[in-house]
Amino acid sequence: MTKSTVDEIRERFDADVERFSNLETGQSATMDSALALDLVARTAAAVTPHAKDLLDIGCGAGNFSLKLLSYLPGLSITLNDLSQPMLVRAGERIATQTCGSLARVQADIREWEPGLEKFDVIVAAAVLHHLRTPAEWEATFTKLFNALRPGGGFWIFDLVKHEIPTVQETQWSRYSDYLVDFQGNGYRDKVFAYIEKEDTPAPLTYQLELLRRV
């Protein structure tokens, strides 16, 4: 199957802002979204308690930045997303919650250069599964590692694929059950259809090995 283009992905997210705007539930099509929000924010704050600058890749409507602000008040935040409506909503929600600076960058992370040693914390939540090739994974991880200050942290929450088929089938079955319980068979089919069309998740072990290499 031919995967979605960048423009097609942007258009879908432009029309789906509300689903990404609830801090209590997180992104509802994702299992354990609210738990992940808190775990990432709480752990990032513990690891880098004196963090000043946050980069939120694929920020959506800003949930991860907002949750991090609850643990690290006053952060200066750079928001990055393909979708301008998402960036607008994220900026509106965050601007009143921090005394730090706020920047918004509408760009594909594959094409944007965030700079060298500019951030203490980088978060990439449900975005890296849009990377298509090993070269894109390596280039993106390299630029994000280079954008971290010494002692900084890079935090990922994402859809992953498992190398062992039976494990993949088991986790996919559990995800199916979650979606059906949440909104029924039709919703499950809709989510699975756009994952098939749009996403190219990589195994966790692959990502860890690549992070060590870069």
Which residues does each PLM region occupy?
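Conserved class I S-adenosyl-L-methionine
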Residues: 1-48, 67
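Class I SAM-dependent methyltransferase SAM/SAH-binding core
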Residues: 53-57, 61-112
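A conserved beta-strand element that flanks and buttresses the S-adenosyl-L-methionine
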Residues: 123
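Short catalytic micro-motifs in class I SAM-dependent methyltransferases
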Residues: 126-130
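A short glycine-rich, Lys/Arg-flanked "PGG" loop and its adjoining helix->strand segment in the class I
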Residues: 138-150
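Short glycine-centered segments of the SAM/dcSAM-binding site in methyltransferase folds
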Residues: 152-154
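C-terminal alpha-helical "lid/dimerization" subdomain adjacent to the S-adenosyl-L-methionine
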Residues: 157-212
